[in-house]
Amino acid sequence: MSKIIGIDLGTTNSAVAVLEGTESKIIANPEGNRTTPSVVSFKNGEIIVGDAAKRQAVTNPDTVISIKSKMGTSEKVSANGKEYTPQEISAMILQYLKGYAEDYLGEKVTKAVITVPAYFNDAQRQATKDAGKIAGLEVXRIVNEPTAAALAYGLDKTDKEEKXXVFDLGGGTFDVSILELGDGVFDVLSTAGDNKLGGDDFDQKIIDHLVAEFKKENGIDLSTDKMAMQRLKDAAEKAKKDLSGVTSTQISLPFITAGEAGPLHLEMTLTRAKFDDLTRDLVERTKVPVRQALSDAGLSLSEIDEVILVGGSTRIPAVVEAVKAETGKEPNKSVNPDEVVAMGAAIQGGVITGDVKDVVLLDVTPLSLGIETMGGVFTKLIDRNTTIPTSKSQVFSTAADNQPAVDIHVLQGERPMAADNKTLGRFQLTDIPAAPRGIPQIEVTFDIDKNGIVSVKAKDLGTQKEQTIVIQSNSGLTDEEIDRMMKDAEANAEADKKRKEEVDLRNEVDQAIFATEKTIKETEGKGFDAERDAAQAALDDLKKAQEDNNLDDMKAKLEALNEKAQGLAVKLYEQAAAAQQAQEGAEGAQATGNAGDDVVDGEFTEK
């Protein structure tokens, strides 16, 4: 069975890992980095992903960042003169991760385990699965990020029972999960979180502060200048990271804008104390889900054995202090917060392929599921933190006499009224026989699969007629749309491959021309004119093909030049070797002669 890669598709950064033997290994990207920025940019028809895309974000307006925050919505992004769904942009990131994983493994990758925040709703999970499909990946499992982290943390501790709180603060989302680990079973007891809280919000606090201070000093509002704002974002992210290690950092942005008197520069010192003050409300927001998760798990703080930090934003000192204060425990720092989620996903991939034995993952649904009933009430069928996969049925009836159909309004959330919760979908059960209200028996069944994706069935117990839907939110893609996007993604991948081959060929041609010209110059007057003339003719042919920009001709002429240049190089080598041999022979003869000169006659006297 081929490898199933593990992917942490993050808001700010993404990572990919694979199981090698019993060890989960992060795969470095082509630039040698173990995480890849979740950034996509478009330039001259080319799709650029990762570090290269992030580097040009300041100057390229066709750059998309933090697309994960839009997953599960109908919102689209405009770039490259087109509109893209969040699934399509995410697929470009996944395709890039898949590509360099294939280069590392030396084989095609078709399956992946992809992680999502524990608090992702059904629409967001479905969107993630669709993104995988567009990227040419079969998503064998969607795993909650804190659960994946626990898998990576706890794999070597499966013989020891313990309860762990996973505190996961990423670039755009925040989750807390309480798990019980023991005998190879990873049992999620509860999860809570905030899908609108992450490192991006901490960056934004710094940006807002810089904009306000600059306006106060210079009377210019930088928030209306797109390029200045991108530079501020980069500077804010760097300052945030710096302040995890030092107590003060200098923010210097020369030529940030121009005033009446000429160019203006932004120079500011940001202390950790000021940063803590700016972000105090964000840190406070992390405390409520911790309490909620503990309460839902029915545990007290003293029953938690380990607190595991996940996500780059957990490096912020104020966040670490808040975790200590809230849990009364020193967080466990034995795992890399940027890499542990992808590593856990790869372990789950190993569980699926059978490479990892005796490990069972029991995850939960993060939000309650139910339907709207009479009076706009939200009636729950499955409570939050129910272990998945699961199925639950309940019988309802009609609200009016001779009602021919019932509308099933499927919802997810915790509020008592339907209007205050998230609509997952609607469908209708028709052809109900005429009867007084309350008589027809309509059985509604909810199914949640191992990926947390919901399907709902309504059945008239009188006629046995039933209607089933897999939930498609208003952001959901049809099979036709996914197929079209898959074809686009494949076409782009092929175009990117051809473009890379073209660049590699041009580089080879330049290198060959340079090397051959050097060799021809070095061999001047050394007696092998025939080889030099042949190499020069091949060199001229290649230069002509390069001028004509004929790729096929360049390829053929490059091969011809390499052959002629090799012949010339062999002659040069043979001549150098012969000269070396002659020199060694002469030195040997001289040494022998000198040895004779050094002989001294000695007198021997007998005693």
UniProtKB/Swiss-Prot annotation:
Comp. bias regions, Acidic residues: 598-607
Chain intervals with Low complexity compositional bias: 579-591
Phosphothreonine modification, residue list: T173
Annotated spans, Disordered: 579-607
Coiled-coil regions listed in the entry: none
A molecular function GO annotation: unfolded protein binding
NCBIfam families according to UniProt: PRK00290.1 (NF001413), prok_dnaK (TIGR02350)
Family designation: Belongs to the heat shock protein 70 family.
Function of the molecule: Acts as a chaperone.
Protein name: Chaperone protein DnaK
Species assigned in the record: Streptococcus pneumoniae serotype 19F (strain G54)
